[in-house]
From Swiss-Prot:
Gene responsible for this protein: mraY
InterPro entries per UniProt: Glycosyl_transferase_4, PNAcMuramoyl-5peptid_Trfase, PNAcMuramoyl-5peptid_Trfase_CS
Source species, domain of life: Bacteria
Organism whose genome encodes this protein: Solibacter usitatus (strain Ellin6076)
UniProt name for this protein: Phospho-N-acetylmuramoyl-pentapeptide-transferase
Localization per Swiss-Prot or TrEMBL: Cell inner membrane
Enzyme class, first EC level, given as a word: transferase
């Protein structure tokens, strides 16, 4: 909105407004808008959540030290979502469909999280939507996202090839184009791509959700991940950088830089209140929304593989749960970790909460920096 006003309409009369044609400038403004919006609205939302007694319910099988956190205002993810959506609408060029798809991913998975949080509040326990029901909703969203990409591909706005780190000349596609030519086998031809995309988005939305178990842990890692995605989105949409780094240039991804910048600023703003000891929790509305948005952006900019490193801690947390559950069922009650997800394992080992958070942040930053260095490697 401000982009159209300040640049499209007024730059002819006020020459300094030409600066708003630069993606970097608008990304900086979007990040700052998201940051200050989140910080400004935080106290009001915390008071309202306390007024309506929307507090966190702690699972009984979790660490005993967490019982003191019961009643802390939750569903703060609503604040994160608002602080991402408004700056994106203000500073992005809304003629690009990628921006709307990223917003849809954030709002869609955020809505699923909202339903889960609402169920927990109304039932007054730590169990919201059933696991199966939540997965069904998530996969519906994932397949809808994949379908939108296929529509854009038909108009030449999206490529289904994948970028493989260290093998930049090797760009496989998950579409079986020979089968897509026949209407009777079209579904089979697009199935591998749709399943892959849905799995990526569902996995990361749940991975962030599983990581959100310590004050500031998940949101701090989101600051790092969103910052790295901001760099990748900018590089992929910049003609000279994309050519230099041998990336598949897509000018449509440049406006995702504004969305990622908003996500970085909003996450940083929420950390202001979520840092230990937390005044508010993001709840599933925040964790599912952020995880889904992160994955959607990675798919749009063709960096699904690098997301394994950018969101490396999220991946480890998710796999710790998968391994723990698998071991318990297949090995007749034997566990690999003292407790899952992984951060609870270190709590059981005697690590303090603040030490776990700081060390996981450091590890997440190292992994994100490694992911960015691979851009230069052939």
């Amino acid at each position: 909105m401000l982009y159209f006003l300040l640049y499209e309409q007024l730059h002819r009369y006020i020459s300094p407004f030409r600066v708003f044609s630069y993606t970097t400038v608008r990304t900086a403004f979007a990040s700052l808008t998201a940051l200050f919006l989140c910080i400004a609205l935080g106290p009001w939302l915390i008071n309202k959540l306390r007024e309506f007694q929307i507090g966190q319910y702690i699972r009984e099988e979790g660490p005993k030290s967490h019982q003191k956190k019961a009643g802390t205002p939750t569903m703060g993810g609503v604040l994160i979502v608002i602080s991402i959506v408004i700056p994106t609408l203000l500073w992005a060029d809304l003629r690009y469909p990628y921006v709307w798809i990223a917003l849809a991913g954030l709002l869609g998975y955020g809505w699923i999280g909202f339903l889960d949080d609402y169920a927990k509040v109304t039932k007054q326990r730590n169990l919201g939507l059933s696991g199966k029901r939540k997965l069904v909703y998530q996969f519906i969203m994932g397949f809808a996202f994949a379908a939108s990409l296929l529509v854009m591909r038909a108009y030449g706005d999206f490529s289904t090839t994948m970028n493989i780190p260290f093998l930049k000349q090797f760009k496989p596609s998950l579409l079986m184009t020979s089968m897509m030519a026949n209407p009777w086998t079209y579904v089979i031809g697009v199935a591998p791509f749709c399943i892959f995309v849905a799995l990526v988005v569902v996995f990361y939305s749940n991975a962030v959700n599983l990581t959100d178990g310590l004050d500031g842990l998940a949101i701090g890692l989101m600051v790092i991940a969103a910052g790295a995605l901001t760099v990748l989105a900018y590089a992929g949409g910049h003609a000279q950088l994309a050519q230099y780094l041998q990336l598949a240039r897509n000018p449509r991804t440049s406006e995702l830089t504004i969305f990622c910048g908003s996500m970085t600023g909003a996450s940083l703003g929420f950390l202001w209140y979520n840092a230990h000891p937390a005044e508010i929790f993001m709840g599933d509305v925040g964790s599912l929304g952020l995880g889904g948005a992160m994955a959607v952006v990675a798919v749009l900019i063709k960096q699904e593989i690098l997301l394994l490193f950018i969101g490396g801690i999220f991946v480890l947390e998710a796999f710790s749960v998968i391994l723990q559950v698998g071991s318990y069922k297949l090995r007749h009650g034997k566990r690999i970790f003292k407790m899952a997800p992984l951060h609870h394992h270190f709590e059981a080992l005697g690590w303090t909460e603040s030490k776990i958070i700081a060390r996981f942040w450091i590890a997440g930053l190292v992994l994100a920096l490694f992911a960015l260095t691979t851009l230069k490697l052939r």
